[in-house]
Amino acid sequence: MSALRLIVGLGNPGPEHAQTRHNAGFRFVDALIERSGARWALDSKLFGETAKVEVAGQPVWLLKPATFMNLSGKSITAALRFWKIEPEHLLVAHDELDLAPGTARLKFDGGHGGQNGLRDTIRLLGHGKFHRLRVGIGHPGHKDRVVPWVLGRAGREDDAAIGAAVDAAIDVLPLAMEGNFNEAMKRLHTEKK
């Protein structure tokens, strides 16, 4: 499996969206920034904020699109082109309705599963052959409640669980950085007793 060179967190920009469930991807890359001591810098040609950090001694670019969720592919494809990175070296972190808060899952390839940031990225790339980190936010129970759910803030317990899932994903990230994605998946997906 290919080593990672670009990690993107999906979300919506602006303080009004900062703590929403939909910004679980932003939360992941922000946690990486916090651990590394790096800082975000706005890069208008890439339509987002960028930073370069090291994980397990490997350099990796981080990106937070400033395009709003539904247009995330514009920023992601611009970054891939600019840094000459193939999609197989890309990890996109995003919120996942179909996983409970406290759960995070890695996968490679597939569809968008209704996630509009992934939908736009797949549309612009022409395929879904890239890595994903799915951060569980839970489902409100009925499809009519999805929009207010993802754009709303999680309660204290769910928020703590989402934070724990982000931390668990960061803990296995060195394996993925080294190209050992299957082992990273195995460790992340194994329930802690």
UniProtKB/Swiss-Prot annotation:
Keyword Hydrolase listed: yes
Localization (cell): Cytoplasm
Site entry (Stabilizes the basic form of H active site to accept a proton), positions: D95
Gene: pth
Record keywords: Cytoplasm, Hydrolase, RNA-binding, tRNA-binding
Lineage: superkingdom: Bacteria
A biological process term (GO) from this entry: rescue of stalled ribosome
Annotated InterPro entries: Pept_tRNA_hydro, Pept_tRNA_hydro_CS, Pept_tRNA_hydro_sf
Subunit structure: Monomer.
Catalytic residues of the enzyme: H22
One protein family per Pfam: Pept_tRNA_hydro
GO (cellular component) term, any one: cytoplasm
Enzyme Commission number(s): 3.1.1.29
PROSITE patterns: PEPT_TRNA_HYDROL_1
Chief subcellular location: cytoplasm
Signal peptide interval: none
Residues spanning the membrane: none
Name used for this protein in its record: Peptidyl-tRNA hydrolase
Gene Ontology terms for molecular function: peptidyl-tRNA hydrolase activity; tRNA binding
Keyword match Ribonucleoprotein: no
Family to which the UniProt record says this protein belongs: Belongs to the PTH family.
UniProt-annotated binding residues for tRNA: H17, F68, N70, N116
Residues the UniProt record annotates as site (Discriminates between blocked and unblocked aminoacyl-tRNA): N12
Described function: Hydrolyzes ribosome-free peptidyl-tRNAs (with 1 or more amino acids incorporated), which drop off the ribosome during protein synthesis, or as a result of ribosome stalling.
Catalytic activity: an N-acyl-L-alpha-aminoacyl-tRNA + H2O = an N-acyl-L-amino acid + a tRNA + H(+)
